[in-house]
């Protein structure tokens, strides 16, 4: 909302947008706000928040003669938008929840226009609570709406004004008998009517009764009824102490008047002067309990609240109320102001738990019966006269303006807004700016009560009328949803965030409301609705429902909230979608309450230039755990789009598309409809397709159905087995999508064009917000940025804080002697309670949570968009690319590339490495930046596949099971030369002598191909680690960079580096690229992917420990290790600490450093041989060489073996660092039998 742009309602720019509260008012509600006694507290700013608006509103109340009052309903009808309001409110502390509800209501009432001269209450409902009847307004033209009942003493003013209640007085010709006086009126006019049992009676002119005698209506029941959703439609105006049926007749009226119904009068209708309301007293009247059935001692006077106390009472029975079910007692003070107006204020008194008023249901029924009398016709009608039949036979007549132009509940809501605007902001003799009117309207649009929404509902114009208020609050206690921890909690100090949020929702769109052409050509045969498909939030209308869906899917901002009803973290990309979600709760009778607001801008390239993809059918996706509607973020070559996933309980299989030309009858075999994988018999072709597409357990001996050779996730073991044979080109050629058995000549064509099998990909669903991402890198970045909390930990004590200033203040107050120290950043996992000190550890920890979150997504063959459902992708192909199954030439030219190729989409290449490993696009960076591999390492598969690629792919391979598959036409070539010829002849592409089997790249030499496969497809990088950096493993992409780093950072000459380390710096140079050395290198490389643990030993190279330091640095004992390390590191008198890698000029300096920093004292022994000083203790090596030596691996029972995953480490420090990557939550789950390795 906030985008309504109807020209005649520019001055109402937010009347049906955010009528509840303004940005300046969203953060001021607190128990410290106090007002003066008697309801005349300090005037608060109206919704706009400036004093000028208050003065203008007061002037509007004091001067009833306004040029704009000529017509009560002279405004044209804007688009019908049932108002849905969103307010971000604060909570101070949980124990103040009860007081906060009252205070917030007070502020909202004041924002709605209460002034010293004449408070105008508003029956707003904030934070899920309905407000009580507001105080009285002296504006005579205030139609009966939720902004307060407007009535005044016209005898005092001496003017002939529009009296809303004149028609309900006794007419001499009809009912000369007056009403008997009330039995109990303690002070002048306050009513305390007894309970009643007369049925409700309300009669039109014919005299049939529908309303009960108003003199017998208890105030508690009437007040409890006053905030029903029907009056939020603009039909009646309620006042304090009056029911919806009899709203507006004061409690202090003379005997001929009752607390009866207040109806909207026809424009310009003058009330007869026979029924002015005279206030009997100008001093504050006696306070008495009128809000509840039971009586209790009055409480001390508190601030006037015309919006919260009775709201609490009403919300006690509401399903959405978070407070206790105790009925709230209120007392109403009637005060005659100096100008002759009577003002009522409502204050809350303590009450004991008692049953609510038993006759509220009857009030609801009577209200419903009355509202059904208002006809809804497309043409204007004259005033309708209705009469109230009282219990003693007295009949009161009144004129009701028919709801003639209200087509649905939204327009009724707008009518209420327009009348409320006139009731408050139209001054006499002064021109009021649209801004002032708008600010007043924001506080006066009527709200609804959840209880009434649940219990009643009525039909108006053939449509269901519901309330339209939505409250977005910060609950007193944190939401229990899975995403509660993520995001920043709104507090009083975050007023700028709340203000920005309200400004966004209240902002006026500079563009006019879109109106489509609803007159299509006759030959189109389109049946369009009369008003098109309209967004109820902003008023834009569209010709097609798909256009409306795209309108809701546009990306203009990122709003994250925690919906307390859904108990989940939700992400919205525009305010219309946010308010649409609120409307869904409203339609169920609930009031949306949210917390933990986080707003972020959306990048320009993600905001524009991307087609909005929405599902056009309620299509099926595999029934995975998750919400019913969630956005999909597909990433491919920078394109990001959003979509909507609709989960359907019964999944309909997607049948193959018809081929052009049609396939011959012998192309496929569908004779027996028996699954060739599991021998299950199916009934027909659709049953066979459903058998292959339904979710099922993984294949035997496998933990998932993710193909290790291509980035594809299959639904079940039958589909997985059939897909595996497509890589080996073995019979039977069974389609993994539909289960058909095909001939080899037609198999690839069927997979490519009919079933679009190669469009499957692996996606990852965020466990916190259920957003689906196309790559593991993107979801890890999303979780770290959106859901993980970062704390500033005190370096002295275990305290941690959310902000650096708080940590600094803690240091200043608690540890004044350590002010020079800085707080440490720690990172908390959003999916468990594990805390990490380094981001790489947290990123590695995510792998354990993301394995169960893998889902199957579908990539468009012609563009980089991803879809959660195959049917949605087919609709996208049909509507966007205009050819259904786009020719696969476009696939090769577009971003899709070879569908079996993981290189075209780096974020999804991870599956080919380890079923969910991170992408290798950062493979050239240091290991601090690279992401760790998956905890499922299928290393035997890697070795086997790498052997195929390294040998057969280079030597030609014969016709082995490897072969080459064309990424453009998916044709399979057993020989390398045949593949090169095919690419040049069929597609005009020049391919080098050594093409890669997993992507389109080709190379001139076999080593280049092997390096490409190792780095890009297996994720095993050839890195050059620095053995002198012990605080963190530093790796480099080339030997030259490593040597420069050692020379500059550690001060070692280049000669020592080259002579001492030889070929062991590079993990296998070109001279040792083949043979056993390559296998050793692969083993060590595959173990070096984890950034925070050292690699386990493998085998020893030539030149063992005693080769004078020219061999690799893997030793059987710490003494031999230190001897060789010192021989390498000490050159020209330079001493280096073996614990931290720092270099020193003398052994004495090194000794002092080791004693001060590492607490290692001198000890006799071999230290002198090591050059460490006399008697200095030799530190054990903290780092080990990845090349591997002949030192044995730790035994399974060795204390250096990880008890969780069995990984062996060579030092307790490395074991401890590695063990922290698992997290305690993961370890507990594994010990309980629910975790995966």
From Swiss-Prot:
The modification Omega-N-methylarginine is found at residues 1061, 1102. It holds the Pfam family zf-C2H2_11. The keyword Transcription applies. One of its GO terms (molecular function) is DNA binding. Residues 914-926 have a biased composition (Low complexity). Residues 1-151, 163-331, 879-957, 1052-1117, 1166-1195 are annotated as: Disordered. InterPro entries: Zn532-like, Znf-C2H2_11, Znf_C2H2_sf, Znf_C2H2_type. Residues 1060-1074 have a biased composition (Gly residues). Gene3D superfamilies: Classic Zinc Finger. Belongs to the krueppel C2H2-type zinc-finger protein family. May be involved in transcriptional regulation. This is Zinc finger protein 687. It comes from Mus musculus (Mouse). The lineage of its organism: Eukaryota, Metazoa, Chordata, Craniata, Vertebrata. The gene is Znf687.
């Amino acid at each position: 909302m906030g985008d309504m742009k109807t020209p005649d309602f520019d001055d109402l720019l937010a009347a049906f947008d955010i009528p509840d509260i303004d940005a300046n008012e969203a953060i001021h509600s607190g128990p410290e706000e106090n007002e003066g006694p008697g309801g005349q507290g300090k005037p608060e700013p109206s919704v706009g928040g400036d004093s000028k608006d208050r003065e203008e509103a007061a002037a509007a109340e004091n001067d009833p003669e306004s040029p704009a009052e000529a017509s009560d309903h002279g405004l044209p009808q804007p688009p019908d938008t049932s108002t849905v309001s969103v307010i971000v409110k604060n909570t101070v502390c949980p124990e103040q929840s009860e007081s906060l509800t009252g205070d917030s209501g007070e502020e909202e009432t004041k924002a709605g226009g209460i002034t010293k001269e004449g408070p105008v209450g508003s029956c707003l409902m904030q934070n899920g609570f309905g407000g009580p009847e507001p105080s009285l307004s002296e504006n005579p033209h205030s139609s009966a709406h939720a902004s307060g009942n407007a009535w005044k003493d016209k005898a005092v003013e001496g003017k002939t004004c529009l009296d809303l209640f004149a028609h309900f007085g006794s007419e001499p010709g009809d009912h000369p008998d007056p009403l008997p006086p009330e039995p109990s009126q303690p002070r002048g006019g306050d009513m305390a009517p007894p309970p009643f049992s007369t049925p409700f009676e309300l009669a039109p002119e014919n005299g049939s009764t529908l309303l009960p005698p108003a003199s017998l209506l208890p105030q508690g029941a009437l007040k409890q009824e006053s905030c029903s959703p029907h009056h939020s439609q603009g039909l009646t105006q309620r006042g304090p102490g009056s029911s919806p049926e009899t709203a507006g007749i004061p409690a202090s009226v003379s005997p001929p008047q009752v607390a009866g119904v207040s109806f909207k009068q026809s424009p310009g209708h003058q009330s007869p002067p026979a029924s002015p309301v005279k206030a009997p007293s100008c001093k504050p009247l006696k306070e008495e309990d009128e809000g509840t059935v039971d009586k209790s001692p009055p409480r001390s006077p508190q601030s006037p609240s015309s919006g919260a106390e009775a709201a609490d009472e009403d919300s006690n029975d509401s399903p959405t109320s978070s407070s206790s079910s105790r009925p709230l007692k209120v007392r109403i003070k009637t005060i005659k102001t100096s100008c002759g107006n009577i003002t009522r204020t409502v204050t809350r008194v303590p009450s004991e738990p008692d049953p609510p008023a038993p006759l509220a249901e009857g009030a609801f029924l009577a209200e419903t019966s009355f509202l059904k009398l208002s006809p809804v016709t497309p043409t204007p009608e004259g005033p309708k006269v209705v009469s109230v039949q009282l219990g003693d036979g007295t009949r009161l007549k009144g004129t009701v303006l028919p709801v003639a132009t209200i087509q649905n509940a939204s327009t009724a809501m707008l009518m209420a807004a327009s009348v409320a605007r006139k009731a408050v902001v139209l001054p006499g003799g002064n021109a009021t700016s649209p801004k002032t009117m708008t600010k007043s309207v924001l506080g006066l649009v009527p709200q609804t009560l959840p209880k009434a929404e649940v219990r009643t509902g009525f039909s108006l114009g053939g449509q269901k009328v519901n309330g339209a208020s939505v409250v977005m609050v910060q609950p007193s206690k944190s939401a229990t949803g899975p995403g509660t921890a993520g995001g920043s909690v709104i507090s009083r100090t975050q007023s700028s965030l709340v203000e920005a949020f309200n400004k966004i929702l209240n902002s006026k769109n500079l563009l006019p409301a879109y109106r489509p052409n609803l007159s299509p050509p006759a030959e189109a045969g389109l049946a369009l609705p009369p008003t098109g498909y309209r967004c109820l939030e902003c008023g834009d209308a569209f010709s097609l429902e798909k256009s409306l869906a795209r309108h809701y899917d546009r990306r203009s901002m990122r709003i994250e909230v925690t919906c307390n009803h859904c108990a989940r973290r939700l992400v919205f990309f525009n305010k219309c979608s946010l308010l649409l979600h609120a409307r869904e709760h409203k339609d169920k009778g609930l009031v949306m309450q949210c917390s933990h607001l986080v707003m972020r801008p959306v990048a320009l390239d993600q905001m524009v230039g991307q087609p909005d993809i929405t599902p056009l059918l309620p299509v099926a996706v595999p029934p995975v755990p998750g919400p019913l509607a969630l956005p999909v973020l597909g990433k491919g070559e920078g394109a990001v789009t959003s979509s909507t996933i609709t989960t359907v309980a019964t999944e309909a299989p997607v049948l193959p598309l018809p081929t052009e030309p049609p396939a011959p009858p012998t192309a496929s075999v569908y004779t027996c409809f028996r699954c060739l994988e599991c021998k299950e018999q199916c009934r027909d072709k659709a049953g066979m397709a459903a058998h292959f597409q339904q979710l099922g357990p993984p294949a035997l001996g496998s933990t998932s159905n993710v193909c290790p050779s291509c980035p594809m996730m299959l639904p079940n073991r039958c589909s997985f087995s059939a897909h595996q044979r497509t890589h080996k080109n073995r019979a039977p050629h069974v389609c993994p999508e539909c289960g058909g058995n095909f001939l080899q000549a037609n198999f690839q064509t069927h997979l490519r064009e009919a079933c679009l099998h190669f469009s499957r990909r692996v996606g990852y669903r965020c466990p916190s917000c259920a957003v689906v991402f196309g790559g593991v890198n993107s979801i890890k970045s999303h979780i770290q940025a959106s859901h993980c909390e970062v704390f500033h930990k005190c370096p002295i004590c275990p305290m941690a804080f959310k902000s650096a200033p708080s940590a600094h203040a803690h240091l200043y107050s608690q540890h004044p002697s350590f002010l020079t120290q800085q707080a440490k950043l720690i990172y908390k996992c959003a999916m468990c309670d594990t805390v990490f000190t380094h981001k790489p550890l947290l990123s590695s920890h995510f792998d354990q949570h993301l394995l169960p979150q893998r889902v199957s997504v579908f990539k468009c063959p012609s563009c980089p968009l991803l879809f959660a459902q195959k049917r949605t992708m087919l609709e996208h192909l049909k509507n966007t690319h205009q050819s259904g199954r786009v020719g696969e030439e476009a696939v090769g030219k577009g971003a899709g590339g070879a569908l079996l190729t993981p290189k075209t989409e780096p974020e999804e290449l991870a599956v080919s490495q380890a079923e969910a490993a991170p992408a290798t696009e950062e493979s050239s960076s240091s290991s601090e930046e690279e992401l760790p591999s998956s905890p499922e390492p299928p290393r035997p598969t890697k070795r086997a596949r790498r052997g195929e690629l390294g040998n057969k792919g280079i030597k030609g391979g014969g016709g082995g099971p490897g072969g080459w598959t064309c990424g453009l036409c998916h044709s399979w070539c057993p020989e390398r030369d045949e593949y090169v010829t095919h690419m040049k002849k069929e597609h005009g592409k020049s391919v080098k002598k050594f093409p890669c089997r997993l992507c389109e790249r080709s190379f001139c030499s076999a080593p280049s191909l092997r390096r490409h496969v190792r780095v890009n497809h297996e994720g095993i990088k050839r890195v050059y680690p620095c053995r002198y950096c012990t605080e963190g493993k530093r790796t480099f992409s080339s030997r030259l960079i490593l040597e420069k780093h050692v020379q500059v950072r550690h001060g070692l000459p280049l000669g020592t580096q080259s002579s001492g380390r030889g070929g062991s710096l590079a993990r296998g140079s070109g001279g040792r690229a083949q043979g056993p050395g390559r296998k050793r290198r692969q083993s060590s490389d595959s173990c070096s992917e984890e950034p925070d643990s050292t690699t386990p030993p493998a085998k020893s190279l030539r030149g063992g420990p005693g080769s004078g330091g020219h061999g690799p640095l893997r030793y059987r004992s710490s003494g031999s290790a230190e001897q060789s390390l010192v021989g390498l590191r000490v050159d020209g008198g330079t001493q280096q600490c073996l614990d931290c890698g720092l270099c020193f000029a003398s052994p004495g300096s090194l000794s002092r450093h080791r004693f001060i920093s590492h607490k290692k004292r001198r000890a006799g022994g071999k230290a002198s041989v090591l050059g460490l000083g006399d008697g200095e203790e030799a530190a054990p090596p903290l780092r080990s060489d990845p090349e591997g030596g002949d030192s044995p691996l730790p035994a399974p029972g060795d204390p250096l073996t990880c008890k969780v995953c069995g990984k062996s480490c060579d030092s307790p420090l490395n074991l401890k660092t590695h063990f922290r990557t698992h997290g305690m939550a993961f370890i507990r789950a594994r010990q309980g039998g629910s975790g995966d390795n």
